Every structure is written in structure tokens, then in C-alpha cells.
């Protein structure tokens, strides 16, 4: 068992913009731009797009990338799990289909984090917020971590909280989560075996 498999879950439906993954971005569909970024990762041995619609499949394969049709799933991670089931990759990277601007060097860091820390099972990315307005935006997922960069909580709410009048620059203490996860194969299997938690469903994460 070895190697790194990057799976890009891509579904047609979207609450605000159905079919957005085929939106033009510099002459190519958004999903193809995301594939280009994934393929540029130094750590990636294989890039696979897990789709639920023939239009997405056609766009991805026409651009020369590998795609697989998947069934109905409640979340992208479940779709990744189905696509990765036939692979023996040691690490599976879940890269969201609408992340065409991520730097491949940063994406590689998630894989390196697992190689460097034998006790870590999952790695992801986050960066500082630009300002308080971005921090308050519910579409921006927040993560609060400890001094060792272990995530404590992911939420759409503006965290950390503060006593009335003491909020100040609380937004500087959180980070904005980025849509990529690197899993050890066993950790992904354990996650997929869990029932969705009420907090997960409430937050839509």
C-alpha cells in the first residue's frame, strides 16, 4: 500500500449556482481548473474526479483527466470514499471541486503533514481572515486551533466568542478553513463508518 490519491468530489447540484463547476474560468470549466491544480501537486500520484452527472464527466474527460461516476451521497466525503474504494493509496486527499485557485505547494503541505507526524490521521489547510467582515460571513468556515495547530472546532459562526463588549479583534484568533483534507486511508474508513453528527448536519459542514 503506497501513494497519494487526490479525489475531487464534483456534484452538479448547488444551492446557489447549479452547475457552477462548469462555469467558465479563463476559457476552461472551473472543475478543469481545479484538476490542473491537483495535477501540479508534487505529492499526487493520481488525480480522480468523482462526479454525479454526465455533463461533469464529459467536461473532465475531454480535458484529459480521469473521472468516475458515483452514486447519490449526503456529502462530498462519502463520494470520495466511494471513488477511493478500489485504490490502495496510503493517503487520500479530498479536494473540493470549487478550489481552482489553491496553490499546489500549499496542497502538498497537507500530505507532508501526515508524513512528518506519525500520530496525525487527517490534515487540512486554513489561513488568517482578511478582516472582521469576512470572519462574520457564514459562508466562510472558521477553525480554531490550539498552540500545536490541532483543530478544536469548525463552524460557520464567528468564533471565538467573547463576553459582551470584549470581542475586540477576536476575528484574528480564528482561521478560515480551506476545502482540502488529506486522510490516512484507515482514518477515512473510520470517518465514513460514523453516522453524521447533529452538529455536522446543523452547520452543513
Question: Where do the protein language model's features map onto the residues?
Answer:
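Hydrophobic/aromatic residues located in beta-strands of well-ordered beta-sheets
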Residues: 6, 47-49, 92, 122-123, ...
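Donor nucleotide-sugar recognition loop
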Residues: 195-205
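Short, high-confidence coil segments that cap the C-terminus of an alpha-helix
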Residues: 44, 89, 118-120
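N-terminal glycine-rich phosphate-binding loop and ensuing alpha1 helix
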Residues: 3-50
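Short aromatic/basic micro-patch
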Residues: 16, 101, 182
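Conserved core of the sugar-phosphate nucleotidyltransferase
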Residues: 104-194
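Short phosphate-binding loop-to-helix
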Residues: 48, 54-112
Amino acid at each position: 500500500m503506497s501513494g497519494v490519491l487526490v479525489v475531487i468530489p464534483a456534484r452538479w447540484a448547488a444551492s446557489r449556482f447549479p452547475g457552477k463547476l462548469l462555469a467558465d474560468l479563463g476559457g476552461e470549466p472551473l472543475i478543469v481548473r481545479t484538476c490542473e491544480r491537483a495535477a501540479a501537486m508534487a505529492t499526487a500520484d493520481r488525480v480522480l474526479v468523482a462526479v454525479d452527472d454526465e455533463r461533469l464527466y464529459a467536461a473532465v474527460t475531454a480535458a484529459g483527466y480521469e473521472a468516475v461516476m458515483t452514486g447519490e451521497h449526503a456529502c462530498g466525503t462519502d463520494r470520495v470514499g466511494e471513488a477511493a474504494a478500489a485504490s490502495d493509496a496510503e493517503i487520500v486527499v479530498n479536494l473540493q471541486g470549487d478550489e481552482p485557485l489553491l496553490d499546489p505547494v500549499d496542497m502538498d503541505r497537507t500530505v507532508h503533514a501526515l508524513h512528518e507526524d506519525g500520530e496525525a490521521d487527517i490534515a487540512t489547510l486554513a489561513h488568517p481572515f482578511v478582516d472582521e467582515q469576512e470572519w462574520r460571513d457564514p459562508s466562510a468556515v472558521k477553525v480554531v486551533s490550539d498552540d500545536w495547530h490541532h483543530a478544536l472546532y469548525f463552524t460557520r459562526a464567528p468564533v471565538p466568542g467573547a463576553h459582551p463588549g470584549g470581542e475586540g479583534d477576536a476575528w484574528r484568533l480564528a482561521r478560515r478553513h480551506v476545502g482540502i483534507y488529506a486522510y490516512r486511508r484507515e482514518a477515512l474508513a473510520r470517518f465514513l463508518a460514523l453516522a453524521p453528527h447533529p452538529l455536522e448536519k446543523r452547520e452543513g459542514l
